[in-house]
Amino acid sequence: MSLQMVSAVSNSSLLQPGSSLLNFDGHVFFFGQKGWPKRSCPTGVFFLDIKQNELKMKPAAFSRDSCYLPPLRYPAICTLRGNGESDKHQYIIHGGKTPNNDLSDKIYIMSMVNKTTKKTTFQCIEKDLGGDVPEARYGHTINVVHSRGKSMIVIFGGRSYIPLAQRTTEKWNSVVDCLPSVFLVDFEFGCCTSYILPELQDGLSFHVSVARDDTIYILGGHSLQNNTRPPSLYKLKVDLPLGSPCVTCSILPGGISVSSGIVTQTGDTEFVLVGGYQSDNQKRMICNTIVLEDNKIEIVERVSPDWTPDIKHCRMWFGCDMGKGSVLLGIPGANKQLISDANYFYILRCNKAEEDEEEELTAQTCSQASTEDQGDSTPFEDSEEFSFSAEASSFDVDDIDTYNEDDEEDESETGYWIICCASCNIDINTWVPFYSTELNKPAMILCSSGSGHWVHAQCMDLSESMLLQLSEANVKYFCNEHVHLNKGLQTPKKAVHLKKQPMKRLHKKKTMKLTTPVKKSFLRRLFE
């Protein structure tokens, strides 16, 4: 096992606990940002471009016949293989949290319809469900089982909000474990059936599940009711005859106490379990190999990688399966840093063949890519310490149809921490926000001299009102070094003086005309 650090070039703050990674044709895509999508990527799906140990995120598009897919954190995700010898597959997404902390009970089918060097297009379809529909939840698992030429979707575990009748202002966002029911979903017709098994007594969430043929193994998990991580190991067997399905459960020995573990597949019958937690404040640094053969499971401990000191001493970590024995791990940066999106990312390669193929990352996962689950038991997720926001403007893309990936290749020259002029004093280590609109990067403005270059607004001594005026107005700006060139090339236009109209008095008294007696007698005789 090898551990390698990657540097995030752009928009790394979008990668948060609860996010998911999808693999299509060897290309890894990110889904499930914490906030609502920005205009630069309205779909919320990004292509992870990892080259030369640098991670870049590029927006993806949806087809016109796609439904709306909100960014969901902690959903249940699994793959559905195509028929025949086709390598194409679809992803099934169920449940999860929206940015408004609402829980989803919908199920989506996501597939790739077009892939070019500059643009990737997906199709997302919402599947209608009927019968015993699973309630809205998160932190659960979804798997596909195959029996007698048929396929079924199996949903188990997770957390949900307390019933609406019991919700008060103080307990509005309180969550509980879902009932330990097993749901079978007919993928073709959308019919759902729930099963209550006597072996499953307590609800579980953030557990690990791996499937092979008609059998699902459920390992570990966290019980919110008891606040424990029981070393449980369940075996679910699903038989699909011509009549009603038959679901049986058995308790096996040799379980592991782990929650939020990450499973990656390294072979046809071999999986690797990494990461997770063994208590509320202790990470699980041990790795295990899971082998599924001859209708049985074998879990053995394997040699762990050389964890870096940052990973060993951090309080939390998160990650997702990238496929073929590769896992993306993330840890938050040091608290003393002023840059709020300073996340550190590592790629853990569990397969020896993949250690030599850094660019080939494909995924064949049979379980949910479990993520950090302490957002509900401890205030990590919504605290200011780990609150990040995405800078959508760093993509510099107004229309996804005209997106040019070559525009992102020059970020080293047009970054926020360049030396914009001779008197530039912006340093990444000492910079603090100067304008009220700044958050974690200094405000910059484009100088229109020549081919154009970016300068810091603070180095140009621009006031905040002037900066806002220049950003809203459609005018050219010239920095302090090129402003004299602009004056010499342009002749000032003569200002047209407007004549000031005198204001009329609102209450002007009319002059009274006096009529003499002679005029009165004349008028009287005239009308007689």
Curated annotation (Swiss-Prot):
GO terms for molecular function: chromatin binding; histone H3K4me3 reader activity; phosphatidylinositol binding; phosphatidylinositol-3,4,5-trisphosphate binding; phosphatidylinositol-3,4-bisphosphate binding; phosphatidylinositol-3,5-bisphosphate binding; phosphatidylinositol-4,5-bisphosphate binding; sequence-specific DNA binding. Keywords: Chromatin regulator, DNA recombination, Metal-binding, Nucleus, Zinc, Zinc-finger. Zn(2+) 1 binds at residues 420, 424, 456, 459. GO terms for biological process: B cell differentiation; T cell differentiation in thymus; V(D)J recombination. A zinc finger (PHD-type) spans 417-485. Residues 364-383 are annotated as: Disordered. CDD domains: PHD_RAG2 (cd15569). Zn(2+) 2 binds at residues 447, 453, 479, 482. Residues 373-383 have a biased composition (Acidic residues). It is found in: Nucleus. Pfam families: RAG2 (PF03089), RAG2_PHD (PF13341). GO terms for cellular component: DNA recombinase complex; nucleus. Its main location: nucleus. Belongs to the RAG2 family. The atypical PHD-type zinc finger recognizes and binds histone H3 trimethylated on 'Lys-4' (H3K4me3). The atypical PHD-type zinc finger also binds various phosphoinositides. Component of the RAG complex composed of core components RAG1 and RAG2. Core component of the RAG complex, a multiprotein complex that mediates the DNA cleavage phase during V(D)J recombination. V(D)J recombination assembles a diverse repertoire of immunoglobulin and T-cell receptor genes in developing B and T lymphocytes through rearrangement of different V (variable), in some cases D (diversity), and J (joining) gene segments. This is V(D)J recombination-activating protein 2. It comes from Gallus gallus (Chicken). The lineage of its organism: Eukaryota, Metazoa, Chordata, Craniata, Vertebrata.
